[in-house]
């Protein structure tokens, strides 16, 4: 059996089409959703990511502004910019790109962002809302994974989902979203004994640990849905990336699998755009 491949690019394009229609409808009512992207320093990957986010927002008809601050920016200067954006009625979403230069406290910055403008979904208020099942802004990558599952007719209800990784950005919110959809969820991490045995019990296996091709065929139950969130450089290849899953071996066992690139990655920016529209609606009562 060879697994079906989940096309994240196609689903992301569908999400962006929906967002573009929503933006056009809001603009017809006199409201243009606005996204502010803040980049501190000159990390090459961060410069690419922020440029993509700003460009995508503009392509979908939003108001988008990129603030590129020097690496010498102080915590207070960054805080002042965030507070200024909190007060700006033309900005509905604020994203501060990580990682920040050494000496700057990302957690403190996140806490300063107005929770209604926290389109990354990282503010403690949004984290709490997610875990108690209240409406709020949800982290983009886990939200994108749920959209992929829906697009391919995978209902988590009654299924055993295993999430490998416990980060605040992916692992924990992923578990919360699966719980909301009535899956039985196990979270694995670096201290989990018998990882392969636990993973083999999964109907839905989400790998979000940041280790190159760590998940192999021995970790996967035949017919399982395997979602690979990892983005890892391949040693010896300047521009090649691979996921946390050994795609070639796992594809022979799984029922559905996401590739890297072209799986979860495109969904992250698409869901950021959806969050920005949602934030604009929340702030204006529409």
UniProtKB/Swiss-Prot annotation:
Task: Give the protein's recorded name.
Answer: Bifunctional protein FolD
Listed pathway(s): One-carbon metabolism; tetrahydrofolate interconversion
- Any one GO cellular component localisation term in the record: cytosol
Which UniProt keyword terms apply here?
A: Amino-acid biosynthesis, Histidine biosynthesis, Hydrolase, Methionine biosynthesis, Multifunctional enzyme, NADP, One-carbon metabolism, Oxidoreductase, Purine biosynthesis
PROSITE patterns attached here?
THF_DHG_CYH_2
Q: Which InterPro entries match?
A: Aminoacid_DH-like_N_sf (IPR046346), NAD(P)-bd_dom_sf (IPR036291), THF_DH/CycHdrlase (IPR000672), THF_DH/CycHdrlase_cat_dom (IPR020630), THF_DH/CycHdrlase_CS (IPR020867), THF_DH/CycHdrlase_NAD-bd_dom (IPR020631)
Catalysis: reaction(s)? (6R)-5,10-methylene-5,6,7,8-tetrahydrofolate + NADP(+) = (6R)-5,10-methenyltetrahydrofolate + NADPH; (6R)-5,10-methenyltetrahydrofolate + H2O = (6R)-10-formyltetrahydrofolate + H(+)
Q: Which HAMAP family match?
A: THF_DHG_CYH
**Keyword Hydrolase listed:** yes
Its BP terms in the Gene Ontology are: L-histidine biosynthetic process; methionine biosynthetic process; purine nucleotide biosynthetic process; tetrahydrofolate interconversion
Q: Where does NADP(+) bind?
A: 165-167, 190, 231
Q: Which family does it belong to?
A: Belongs to the tetrahydrofolate dehydrogenase/cyclohydrolase family.
The record's annotation in NCBIfam families points to: PRK10792.1, PRK14186.1, PRK14188.1
- Native source organism of the sequence: Symbiobacterium thermophilum (strain DSM 24528 / JCM 14929 / IAM 14863 / T)
Q: A Gene Ontology molecular-function term?
A: methylenetetrahydrofolate dehydrogenase (NADP+) activity
Quaternary data = Homodimer.
Instruction: Write down the EC number.
Output: 1.5.1.5, 3.5.4.9
Stated role: Catalyzes the oxidation of 5,10-methylenetetrahydrofolate to 5,10-methenyltetrahydrofolate and then the hydrolysis of 5,10-methenyltetrahydrofolate to 10-formyltetrahydrofolate.
């Amino acid at each position: 059996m060879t697994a079906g491949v989940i096309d994240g690019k196609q689903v992301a394009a569908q999400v962006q089409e929906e967002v573009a229609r929503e933006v056009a409808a809001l603009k017809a009512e006199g409201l243009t959703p606005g996204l502010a992207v803040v980049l501190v320093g000159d990390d090459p990957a961060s410069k690419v990511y922020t440029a993509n986010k700003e460009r995508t927002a503009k392509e979908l008809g939003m108001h988008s502004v990129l603030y590129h601050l020097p690496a010498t920016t102080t915590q207070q200067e960054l805080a002042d910019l965030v507070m200024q954006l909190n007060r700006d009625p033309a900005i509905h979403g604020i994203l501060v790109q990580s990682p920040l230069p050494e000496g700057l406290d990302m957690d403190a910055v996140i806490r300063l962002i107005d929770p209604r403008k926290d389109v990354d979904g990282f503010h403690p208020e949004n984290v709490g809302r997610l875990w108690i099942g209240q409406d709020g802004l949800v982290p983009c990558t886990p939200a994108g994974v749920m959209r992929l599952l829906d697009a391919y007719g995978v209902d988590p209800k009654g299924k055993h989902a295993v999430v490998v990784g416990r980060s605040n950005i992916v692992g924990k919110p992923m578990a919360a979203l699966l719980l909301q959809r009535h899956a039985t969820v196990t979270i694995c991490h670096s201290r989990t004994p018998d990882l392969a045995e636990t993973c083999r019990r999964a109907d839905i296996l989400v790998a979000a640990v940041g280790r190159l091709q760590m998940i192999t065929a021995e970790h996967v139950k035949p017919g399982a849905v395997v979602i690979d969130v990892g983005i890892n450089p391949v040693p010896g290849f300047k521009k090649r990336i691979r996921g946390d899953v050994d795609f070639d071996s796992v594809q022979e066992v799984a029922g559905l699998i996401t590739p890297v690139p072209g799986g979860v990655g495109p969904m992250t920016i698409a869901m950021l755009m959806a969050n920005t529209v949602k934030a604009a609606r929340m702030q204006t009562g529409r």
